[in-house]
Amino acid sequence: MKFFIDTADVKEIREANELGLVDGVTTNPSLIAKSGRRFEEVIKEITGIVDGPISAEVISLEHDGMIAEATELAKIHPNIVIKLPMTPEGLKATKTLYKRGIKTNVTLIFTPMQALLAAKAGATYVSPFVGRLDDISQNGMGIIQEIRTIFDNYGMDAEIIVASIRNPIHVLDSALIGADVCTIPYSVMLQLAKHPLTDAGIKKFLEDWEKVPK
């Protein structure tokens, strides 16, 4: 399973990349706003750090505007993936960009049927949001299993990016189900590496080492 980092914080991206954990990056308008920097400036810097897919989201809500934005974004770097909303206009734009050979990531997916529609329109990636479903007492990971089954049944090419990851269990469940990608906040990436018994073991080794005659 591939790990994308879900952030527009260049410092976090550099640190995660140094750990060997980053196969790609997902950004969105909210994450860019948190950075306090110009959109294009941030995206360009990220492409210089990570050699993998970089999802950059359009702001327009209608087809022609989406295509105009996508065309400009795609010029930034060959690794740019255009992030589009799961709407009828977004699906139309997905189909248009597919025909032009531009990769897409259809986002804000909350049902298996939305994922299937996006895949049929030619999406490179589909991004179901598990944490937000959990927030309203729905089974976020359940739809990942359903999407995986549907895509396998029909040989769909689109890759499943599990998004809105809140904790390490989301990542574990995604791996067990067979999702293609998890896009993970840096804080959760760090949690994946931690265990109290690891810390206790290191402490014990160091304590024992102090007893070795010098």
Curated annotation (Swiss-Prot):
GO MF: aldehyde-lyase activity; transaldolase activity
NCBIfam families: fsa_talC_mipB (TIGR00875)
Localization: Cytoplasm
Active site: 83
Gene Ontology cellular-component terms listed: cytoplasm
PROSITE patterns assigned: TRANSALDOLASE_1 (PS01054), TRANSALDOLASE_2 (PS00958)
Function: Transaldolase is important for the balance of metabolites in the pentose-phosphate pathway.
Biological process per Gene Ontology, one example term: pentose-phosphate shunt
UniProt pathway annotation: Carbohydrate degradation; pentose phosphate pathway; D-glyceraldehyde 3-phosphate and beta-D-fructose 6-phosphate from D-ribose 5-phosphate and D-xylulose 5-phosphate (non-oxidative stage): step 2/3
Enzyme Commission numbers on file: 2.2.1.2
Broad class of where this protein is predominantly found: cytoplasm
Protein name: Probable transaldolase
Substrates-to-products reaction catalysed: D-sedoheptulose 7-phosphate + D-glyceraldehyde 3-phosphate = D-erythrose 4-phosphate + beta-D-fructose 6-phosphate
Keyword annotations: Cytoplasm, Pentose shunt, Schiff base, Transferase
HAMAP family (alphabetical): Transaldolase_3b
Organism in which the protein naturally occurs: Citrifermentans bemidjiense (strain ATCC BAA-1014 / DSM 16622 / JCM 12645 / Bem)
Source organism superkingdom: Bacteria
Pfam family, one: TAL_FSA
InterPro entries registered for this protein in UniProt: Aldolase_TIM (IPR013785), TAL/FSA (IPR001585), Transaldolase_3B (IPR022999), Transaldolase_3B/F6P_aldolase (IPR004731), Transaldolase_AS (IPR018225), TSA/FSA_arc/bac (IPR033919)
Family: Belongs to the transaldolase family. Type 3B subfamily.
Keyword rRNA processing: no
